[in-house]
């Protein structure tokens, strides 16, 4: 199993699909990364067939040019915290654990709010 960006990639998947298992890398970014190493790594290569050198090459590209995993998660959390600190509308919605992007809340808000909390004495 190849370890890229601190993640164990599934060994039987093609490398272009396996890169999507890294937080922050989707289809487009995976395709772009493989385009940068087009001479060395074929997108149809399975992860189990990668050499250590090829895995190292992927690691260096991901570290230099992309924010992935912990670094990206930390940035997103800091952005949310910043919204809360400045008291913006988005920050207020985050603080109250309500939908942030304009969805209705009269009925369909259960996903964001979580399970119902029943009060004692009410049926």
Where are each of the predicted segments found?
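Surface-exposed, charge/polar-rich loops and edge strands
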Residues: 4-11, 17, 41-45
């Amino acid at each position: 199993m190849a370890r890229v960006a601190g993640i164990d990639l599934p060994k039987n998947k093609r490398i272009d699909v396996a890169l999507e298992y890294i937080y922050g890398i989707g289809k487009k970014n995976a395709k772009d990364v493989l385009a940068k190493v087009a001479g060395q790594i074929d997108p149809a290569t399975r992860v189990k067939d990668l050499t250590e050198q090829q895995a190292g090459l992927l690691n260096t590209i991901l570290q230099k040019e992309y924010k992935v995993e912990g670094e990206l998660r930390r940035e997103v959390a800091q952005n949310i915290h910043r919204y809360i600190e400045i008291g913006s509308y988005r920050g207020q919605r985050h603080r109250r654990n309500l939908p942030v992007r304009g969805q209705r809340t009269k009925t369909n808000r259960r996903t964001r709010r979580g399970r119902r909390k029943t009060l004692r004495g009410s049926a």
